[in-house]
C-alpha cells in the first residue's frame, strides 16, 4: 500500500516527517520562552510529586473515583461506554509536543484529586522533604498564574495538536 501511495504521490512520506519535525520545533521553541518553560517545569514538578510512589498513585485513583461518583450522583457527568475512566497523570516527554498536550489535559481532568493528594502528602508525608515539596507543589497548582497558564496552554496546544494529527 505504501509503495502505491508513494508511486502516485512521492512526497506523501514527507508529510509524516514534517509533523514530527513540527512537534520537535514546538518543544524547542517552548524552551526558549521563559514563562512557557517555567510552566512546563512546574507541571512536571507537580506530576512528579503526585506520582512519586505507588501509595500516591493509589490515593490519586481513589480520589478520582470518589470525585466521579460524586459528580455522577449530582448529574454533573454523563455515563456511557468508555466515559469517566480512572486514569493517571501523564508525564510530558522531551520530544513529542503531543505528550505535553496530554500531560496538560490529564492534569485538568484530575485537578481536584491531584490537589487532594498534594494536601495529604503535605500533611502526612514520610519525610520533611516530601512534605515541603508537596507544600510547594500545592501552592503552585492553586496559583492564578499556573491555572491561567494551564488553560491557555491547553487552548493553544489543542490547535497545534489538531494540526499535527492532520499531518500524520
Regions found by a protein language model. Give the residues of each.
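Alpha-helical structural modules in large enzymes and assemblies
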Residues: 1-168
Amino acid at each position: 500500500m505504501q509503495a502505491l501511495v508513494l508511486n502516485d504521490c512521492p512526497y506523501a512520506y514527507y508529510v509524516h516527517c514534517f509533523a514530527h519535525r513540527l512537534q520537535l520545533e514546538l518543544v524547542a521553541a517552548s524552551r526558549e520562552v521563559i514563562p512557557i518553560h517555567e510552566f512546563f517545569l512546574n507541571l512536571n514538578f507537580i506530576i512528579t510529586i503526585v506520582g512519586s510512589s505507588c501509595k500516591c498513585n493509589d490515593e490519586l485513583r481513589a480520589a478520582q473515583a470518589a470525585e466521579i461518583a460524586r459528580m455522577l450522583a449530582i448529574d454533573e457527568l454523563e455515563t456511557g461506554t468508555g466515559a469517566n475512566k480512572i486514569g493517571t497523570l501523564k508525564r510530558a516527554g522531551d520530544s513529542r509536543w503531543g505528550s505535553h498536550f496530554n500531560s496538560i489535559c490529564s492534569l485538568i481532568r484530575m485537578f481536584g484529586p491531584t490537589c487532594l493528594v498534594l494536601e495529604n502528602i503535605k500533611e502526612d508525608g514520610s519525610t520533611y522533604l516530601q512534605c515541603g515539596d508537596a507544600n510547594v507543589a500545592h501552592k503552585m497548582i492553586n496559583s492564578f498564574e499556573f491555572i491561567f497558564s494551564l488553560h491557555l496552554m491547553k487552548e493553544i496546544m489543542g490547535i497545534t495538536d489538531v494540526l499535527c494529527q492532520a499531518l500524520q
